[in-house]
């Protein structure tokens, strides 16, 4: 399996075979579970510290992550966060950008007391096409006759859960938001001969993966 071999090679290349402990961010999803499974194959006798984050008033899947941790014999930790906004200023001061996803902050804070090396499954959706609900909506909003701008607008409309509805109130009048600039950034990914769905994969990879996750994990 090419994907399995590639991930295992990446794990073995990045990690020291003499590592006494390795950490992993473990959700209940396929991506982090796959990384953990292959990590255990590469390091069958190494102590693995797995960490899951549980935010109050959001869907709790930590019971599933606990079962996964038991299957792959990890030392599992569950972080329960009641007020996730409490340390927002500290989190933003680290990455210098207003990221809304704060699970990484609490993961790193916990991991630094466990090990200096940790892995996650972040980026799997962008690499392997995990946002099926978005793809379905995009294909419903577009067709083979849709022009570049129409496809870009449809693509953005598939990300409504990521929008900040009151951004002017939050960022103030000095924040000059311009839709045309957004369209220009995305234009290369939708103005080409690829199929509509492949264009979405291209935009996902060059957008969130390269300009969100990569800078984030480089900062921490």
Q: What is the predicted role of each segment?
A:
Residues 1-200, 216-220:
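ATP-dependent adenylate-handling active sites, centered on carboxylate activation for C-N bond formation
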Residues 205-219:
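Short Ser/Thr-interspersed hydrophobic loop/turn segments at strand-loop and sheet-helix junctions
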């Amino acid at each position: 399996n090419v994907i399995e071999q590639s991930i295992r090679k990446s794990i073995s290349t990045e990690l020291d075979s003499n590592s006494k402990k390795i950490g992993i961010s473990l959700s209940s999803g396929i991506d982090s579970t796959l990384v953990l499974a292959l990590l255990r194959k590469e390091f069958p006798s190494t102590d693995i510290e797995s960490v899951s984050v549980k935010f109050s008033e959001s869907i709790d899947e930590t019971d599933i992550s606990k079962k996964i941790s038991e299957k792959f014999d990890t030392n599992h930790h569950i972080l329960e966060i009641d007020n996730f906004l409490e340390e927002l200023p500290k989190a933003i001061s680290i990455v210098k950008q207003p990221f809304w996803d704060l699970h990484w902050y609490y993961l790193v804070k916990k991991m630094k007391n466990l090990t200096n090396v940790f892995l996650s499954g972040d980026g799997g959706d962008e690499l392997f096409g995990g946002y099926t609900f978005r793809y379905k909506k995009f294909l419903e909003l577009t067709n083979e006759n849709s022009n570049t701008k129409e496809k870009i607008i449809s693509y953005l409309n598939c990300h409504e859960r990521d929008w900040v509805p009151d951004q002017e109130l939050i960022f103030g009048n000095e924040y000059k938001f311009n839709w045309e600039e957004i369209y220009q950034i995305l234009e290369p990914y939708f103005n080409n001969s690829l199929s509509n769905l492949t264009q979405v994969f291209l935009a996902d990879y060059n957008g969130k993966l390269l300009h969100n996750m990569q800078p984030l994990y480089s900062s921490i």
